[in-house]
Amino acid sequence: MKKESQVIFDRNVVEFVTVAAEFCKFLEQAETMKRDTFVDTLLKILPLLYLKAAMLPETEIIGDDAPESYVTEETYEVLRINLAGILAEKDDYLDVFIQDMVYSDQPIKKNISEDLADIYQAIKDFIFVFQLGLNETMNDSLAICQEQFKEYWGQTLVNTLRALHDVKYRQSEEDEPEDDDFEDEGESDCHGHDHGHCDCEKDLNYGY
C-alpha cells in the first residue's frame, strides 16, 4: 500500500509553491527586461521566497525512487547566459561567505546570474514534479527541495540578495552628482573677493 502525505496540503507548502512558481516564471521571461526592473523585482521576490521556504513543515522522503529532474544542463546554461546579459558588468561580485573561503583568505569572485540559475534549478525541479500531482513524488520533491534549501540554495539566495542590493543602491549613489566636490571648488573660488558679488550659488546647478 502506497504511503500518503498530508504535508503537501499544508498552507505553508501551498504558499511556497505559489512563490516558487512565480520566481521561475519571472526568470524564464526576463530575457528582454531592463536591468533596473529586473533587479528591483528580484529584491522583492527573493526575500519572500526565502521566508516561505523557511516556514515549510519538516518533510521526509517516503518513496523508493528519486523524483524526476526537469532542468537539463542546456536549460541551465541558456538561462544563465540570458541573466548574465541583463546584468552585464554588474554580474560579478565578491563573496566571503561560501565554503571555498575555508581554503582562501581572499574573497571569491561569484556571478549573480550563476547563483540565480542554481536557485532556479532546485526550485524548477521541485515545481515540475509537484505539478504532476502524484502524492508520493510531490512529497519527496518537497523534502529534497527543503534539504537543498538548508544545504546550499538558501545561503546562495542570501548572498545573491546582498549582491543585488549593492547593484541597486551603489548604482544610485554613483548616478548622484558629487555635490561635496562642487561645494569645495565653489568655496575656494569665493576666497579673496566680495561675497556680495559672488555667483558661486548660481554656478551650482541644482536643477531649480
Model regions and ranges:
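Context-gated lysine
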Residues: 2-3, 25, 34, 44, ...
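Short, Lys/Arg-enriched, disordered terminal segments
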Residues: 1-7, 203-208
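Intrinsically disordered or highly flexible coil/loop and linker segments, enriched in small
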Residues: 33, 55-62, 89-96, 129-136, ...
